[in-house]
């Protein structure tokens, strides 16, 4: 019997209604009740056609396990109960199999679960796509980008402990197999005002608390931070700790994620240094100080914080202090410097902190994009995931809410357009007559905001750029003049009389009728936030930082690239970003996730109907259902429809052998459903009213009950017959076993009797044999005993004889030993006597010889005594000298000049020689500590000392700086891959220098490369080689004696490289570059390179000899030397 495959459906075991399109009747109350019923049963997902509604459960649910992923993998969208995995799988399969770019739009208010929804989408796609080391690395980098962005872009709010304070759009790129290749992240409207001020009960961005909680003491000391939150004005104290959040563990997670994404250690440390600088900026406080002209000037109260900030960022303290006290306004050739009062100084401080953090966040996004972007250039498929603010209506709505709601208006507009477009395309594709759908078109609201002439954003930009006094009130007056007659704009001060007595509309506000309802905006702060003004002095101060990251964040601060053009406003930038986003979304197939927050307490099992109703209205969910139901409420392919309802018709049950459409037609005709309630498309059947579908479900449920009864009847009959046959078979078996048992029992009794008789007979025979054996044994034992007694008597006799013989032998031995001892003692006595006589003779002879010698040499004793005493004394003095020198040895440092003094004059030469030998020895010991690389560094430093010491004023500042050579890391930076491939030799120097234009003295950035044989110049942006000079053609290097980085490279006349003339450069690493060029040229050409140090020298520019003259510059022009071509024969360099 063939096994029947059971196919599930969305309608099986449905709690409430799984698809709101099928809700009957459809109104706000039934919509909310259906959501609540499903929420109470932990069903947090509900469909509106292909749109997923997600209600935040505020608890963990067991519906995201790997088993669930496999359950929804490659399944039809309506085959299982509603789930975010179903939408993710549908989008992924459409991208992989149909080659359609996809986008998933996730919207909802803060705390509704948008960020978690985006993570679930990404984790599902990562789980179902291909495997492999490279693919897994890409997936891991894409997933680990989330913790980094959350740390820097999320914060605790009253609505959400992990609220995204920026909009994020990620394009995930796939190859033709559906494997991820990389991604690109775009961010929108970071809430940077949170950096300097947070509402009560909320926190600053997570990274500040994570850094202070999780960083080691060593790192905190390096960043000049303390672990106490109360030490920093930018951190709110009432919500510093969040229940269930471990900031220290999260910090370790973020550091690990940064490493996985591709951040190098020095990059991560640079980022944390910027975060620390932002924190410490909030601790700078100002006090007023009166000037002679009567105006107040701001002064910093405590300069310790400023000093630590400058040490972190590498900015000169006086430069930053001046930027907080003065503001310079430039207009063409004029500069005007004005003092800042205390309020302006605080504004400048906060503006700097906000700009520094927001630019750092943008840099982080770009840096992550560099790591996760696809490296291959093959054609890619794209899935975009949009996680952005939902519609916001607060008690106080400002510029941020206005911009956010504008973005949501655009998203609502594209949602309605794409939904209608999708409906229309399906009707046309299925050859169904198209029914026009009436809906509210919010294009008029979008035009009110974004119109280039009369739009609110355009008028706000116009007001910001207008000369004269510009305030929020003047902006509101302009709105009242232009927008008064607009049907979606309301203002108390407008010409429209119907709002003059509206007390709910304050004079300083205006109201817009959005698609989600009316929103009242406070006009205060609109102009200031739109300007987003950062004083030029602060930008220039940041650009002067030695901290490379901070310097790169403020390119407009470069004095060489002064741009007097006003930067674009925040509103215009966001408008352009939204336009780009909308254009991008329109090229993709949309998928929607609408997130809803069930309560404001962030608690599980609580469903606030009023709050949910508010969200349903501004998300336009009822409008969405009505659009879906305007034509046909339900549509389904013929095959699953016939499979589900075939039991309702005898002709189609149990199997239909024709086409599926014919079977559905037969089925519906049999059920007598009115023809106006359904329509047959090319591949689907369309049902107009949900009641028809529910009728089909009721009939199916009744039929299933009937079929269940039939199956039970047949099963019970089969069970009874099977039981009877089993009992009959058992009776036969039992009878056979009983007969066998009776025969076996009778046989056992007979066998037992025979065994008993046999055992008695065998016992009698055995006892008889035992008696005979015992008698024989006793006889043998008696014979043995007699023989033993006789042998014992014989042995005792022999023992007595042997003992007597042994006693006689012992007596003889004792007598012999006593005799030998007496003989030995007599011989010993004789030998001792003879030895005493010999000793006496020797002593007498020695005494006689001594007497004889003393008599002969007595006359010499006194003369020799003095000489011996002198030699002994001299030897003792030298010995004592060496012992004292051993204890007084100086340190092993070669630069230690100390040496013990000598005690006696005659030791002078020895003392000096010993000092020389000791110095040579300790120098050798010091040199032996160095590695070959360190020796090379010291050789270069020694070479630099010989070339520039006491000759070049810049030299002392270079002593403490290590020579690095490859500052650009060309081998690691993919930007310079083309340049790296073009150079086959070892790169000795890779540095960005300023090349001085021969014609006008202006500078251009070039990459300066020195290899073993050549000197090369390359374009900084493209990496293309512009000039290549063999080292044999370099004849001389000229520079001034002053504290500047200008130098000239002279080329051999007539060489190909010298066609345009000598080169003139400016570099921050002049000493290192000149030293390495000198050593490389010497190694290559075996000739010393001429180094000329003079404040005037000649260079060859084409056919002209030009004098380069160094003069004292004006301090007002800053600390950077300037170069100017005076005439055809003179080029002046002004050094401050």
Swiss-Prot record:
Belongs to the TRAFAC class myosin-kinesin ATPase superfamily. Myosin family. GO terms for biological process: actin filament bundle assembly; actin filament organization; actin filament-based movement; endocytosis; post-Golgi vesicle-mediated transport. Residues 578-600 are annotated as: Actin-binding. CDD domains: MYSc_Myo1 (cd01378). Motor protein that may participate in process critical to neuronal development and function such as cell migration, neurite outgrowth and vesicular transport. ATP binds at residues 108-115. The keyword Iron does not apply. There is a cross-link at residue 287 (Glycyl lysine isopeptide (Lys-Gly) (interchain with G-Cter in SUMO2)). Residues 15-701 form the Myosin motor domain. Residues 704-733, 728-748, 750-779, 779-808, 808-837, 837-866 form the IQ domain. It comes from the Eukaryota. Changing residue 385 to G: In a colorectal cancer sample; somatic mutation. Residues 952-1136 form the TH1 domain. This is Unconventional myosin-Ib.
């Amino acid at each position: 019997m063939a096994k029947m495959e059971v196919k599930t459906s969305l309608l099986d075991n449905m709690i409430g209604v799984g698809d709101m399109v099928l809700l009957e009747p459809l109104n706000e109350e039934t919509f909310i009740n259906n959501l609540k019923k499903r929420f109470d049963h932990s069903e947090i997902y509900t469909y509106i056609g292909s749109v997923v509604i997600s209600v935040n459960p505020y608890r963990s649910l067991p519906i995201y396990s790997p088993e669930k992923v496999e359950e929804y993998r490659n399944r039809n969208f309506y085959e299982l109960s509603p789930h975010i995995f179903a939408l993710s799988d549908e989008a992924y399969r459409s991208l992989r199999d149909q080659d359609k770019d996809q986008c998933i739009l996730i919207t909802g208010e803060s705390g509704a679960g948008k960020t978690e929804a985006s993570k679930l989408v990404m984790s599902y796609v990562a789980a179902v796509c291909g495997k492999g080391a490279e693919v897994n690395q890409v997936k891991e980098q894409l997933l680990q980008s989330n913790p980094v962005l959350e740390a820097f872009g999320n914060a605790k709010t009253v609505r959400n402990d992990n609220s995204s304070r920026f909009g994020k759009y990620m394009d995930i790129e796939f190859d033709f197999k559906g494997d991820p290749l990389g991604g690109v992240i775009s961010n929108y409207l970071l809430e940077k005002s949170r950096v300097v001020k947070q509402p009560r009960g909320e926190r600053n961005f997570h990274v500040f608390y994570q850094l202070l909680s999780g960083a080691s003491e060593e790192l905190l000391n390096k960043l000049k931070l303390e672990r106490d939150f109360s030490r920093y004005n930018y951190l709110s104290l009432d919500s510093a700790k969040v229940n269930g959040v471990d900031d220290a563990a999260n910090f370790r997670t973020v550091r690990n994620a940064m490493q996985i994404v591709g951040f190098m250690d020095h990059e991560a440390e640079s980022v944390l240094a910027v975060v620390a600088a932002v924190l410490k900026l909030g601790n700078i406080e100002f006090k007023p100080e009166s000037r002679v002209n009567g105006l107040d000037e701001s002064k910093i109260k405590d300069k310790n914080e400023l000093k630590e900030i400058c040490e972190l960022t590498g900015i000169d303290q006086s430069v930053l202090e001046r930027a907080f006290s003065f503001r310079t306004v430039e207009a063409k050739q004029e500069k005007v410097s004005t003092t800042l009062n205390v309020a302006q100084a605080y504004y400048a401080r906060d503006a700097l902190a906000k700009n520094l953090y927001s630019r750092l966040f943008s840099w982080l996004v770009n840096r992550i994009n560099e790591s996760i972007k696809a490296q291959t250039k093959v054609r890619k498929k794209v899935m975009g995931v949009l996680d952005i603010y939902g519609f916001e209506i607060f008690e106080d709505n400002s510029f941020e809410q206005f911009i956010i709601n504008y973005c949501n208006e655009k998203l609502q507009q594209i949602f309605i357009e794409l939904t209608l477009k999708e409906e229309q395309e399906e009707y046309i594709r299925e050859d169904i007559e198209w029914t026009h759908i009436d809906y509210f078109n919010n294009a008029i609201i979008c035009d009110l905001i974004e119109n280039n002439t009369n739009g609110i954003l355009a008028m706000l930009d116009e007001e910001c750029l207008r000369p004269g006094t510009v305030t929020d009130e003047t902006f509101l007056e302009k709105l009242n003049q232009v927008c008064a007659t607009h049907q979606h704009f309301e203002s108390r001060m407008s010409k429209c009389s119907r709002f003059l007595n509206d007390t709910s509309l304050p004079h300083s506000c205006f109201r817009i009728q959005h698609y989600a309802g009316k929103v009242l905006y406070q006009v205060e702060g609109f102009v200031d936030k739109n300007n987003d003004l950062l004083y030029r002095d602060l930008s220039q101060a940041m650009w002067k930082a030695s901290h490379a990251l901070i310097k790169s964040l403020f390119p407009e601060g470069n004095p060489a690239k002064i741009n007097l053009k006003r930067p674009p406003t925040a509103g215009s930038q966001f408008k352009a970003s939204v336009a780009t986003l909308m254009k991008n979304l329109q090229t993709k197939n949309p998928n929607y996730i609408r997130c809803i927050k069930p309560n404001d307490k962030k608690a599980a099992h609580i469903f606030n109907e009023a709050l949910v109703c508010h969200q349903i209205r501004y998300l336009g969910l009822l409008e969405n259902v009505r659009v879906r139901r305007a034509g046909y409420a339900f549509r389904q392919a013929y095959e699953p429809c016939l499979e589900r309802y075939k039991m309702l018709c005898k002709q189609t049950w149990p199997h239909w052998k024709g086409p599926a459409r014919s079977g559905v037609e037969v089925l519906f005709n049999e059920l007598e459903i009115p023809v106006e309630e359904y329509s047959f498309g090319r591949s689907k059947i369309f049902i107009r009213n949900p009641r028809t579908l529910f009728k089909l479900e009721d009939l199916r449920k009744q039929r299933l009950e009937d079929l269940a009864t039939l199956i039970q009847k047949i099963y019970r009959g089969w069970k009874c017959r099977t039981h009877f046959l089993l009992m009959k078979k058992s009776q036969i078996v039992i009878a056979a076993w009983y007969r066998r048992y009776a025969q076996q029992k009778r046989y056992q009794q007979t066998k037992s009797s025979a065994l008993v008789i046999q055992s008695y007979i065998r016992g009698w025979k055995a006892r008889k044999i035992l008696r005979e054996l015992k008698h024989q044994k006793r006889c043998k034992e008696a014979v043995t005993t007699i023989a033993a007694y006789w042998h014992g008597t014989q042995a005792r006799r022999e023992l007595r004889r042997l003992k007597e013989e042994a006693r006689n032998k012992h007596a003889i031995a004792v007598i012999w030993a006593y005799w030998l001892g007496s003989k030995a003692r007599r011989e010993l006595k004789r030998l001792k006597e003879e030895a005493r006589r010999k000793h006496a003779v020797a002593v007498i002879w020695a005494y006689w010889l001594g007497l004889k010698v003393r008599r002969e040499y007595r006359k010499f004793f006194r003369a020799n005594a003095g000489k011996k005493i002198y030699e002994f004394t001299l030897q003792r003095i030298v010995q004592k000298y060496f012992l004292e020198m051993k204890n007084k040895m100086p340190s092993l440092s070669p630069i230690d000049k100390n040496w013990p003094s000598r005690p006696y004059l005659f030791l002078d030469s020895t003392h000096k020689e010993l000092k020389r030998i000791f110095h040579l020895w300790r120098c050798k010991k010091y040199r032996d500590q160095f590695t070959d690389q360190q020796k090379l560094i010291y050789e270069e430093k020694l070479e630099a000392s010989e070339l520039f010491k006491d000759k070049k004023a810049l030299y002392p500042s270079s002593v403490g700086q290590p020579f690095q050579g490859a500052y650009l890391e060309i081998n690691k930076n993919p930007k310079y891959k083309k340049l790296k491939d073009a150079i086959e030799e070892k790169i000795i120097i890779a540095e960005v220098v300023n090349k001085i234009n021969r014609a006008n003295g202006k500078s251009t950035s070039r990459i300066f490369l020195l290899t073993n044989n050549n000197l090369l110049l390359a374009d900084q942006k493209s990496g293309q080689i512009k000039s290549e000079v063999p080292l044999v053609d370099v004849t001389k290097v000229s520079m001034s004696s002053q504290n500047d980085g200008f130098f000239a490279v002279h080329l051999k006349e007539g060489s190909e490289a010298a066609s345009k003339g000598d080169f003139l450069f400016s570099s921050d690493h002049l000493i290192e570059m000149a030293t390495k060029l000198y050593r490389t040229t010497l190694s290559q050409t075996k000739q010393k390179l001429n180094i000329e140090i003079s404040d005037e020298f000649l260079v060859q520019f084409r056919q002209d000899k030009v004098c380069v003259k160094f003069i004292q510059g004006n301090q007002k022009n800053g600390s950077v030397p300037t170069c100017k071509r005076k005439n055809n024969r003179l080029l002046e360099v002004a050094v401050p």
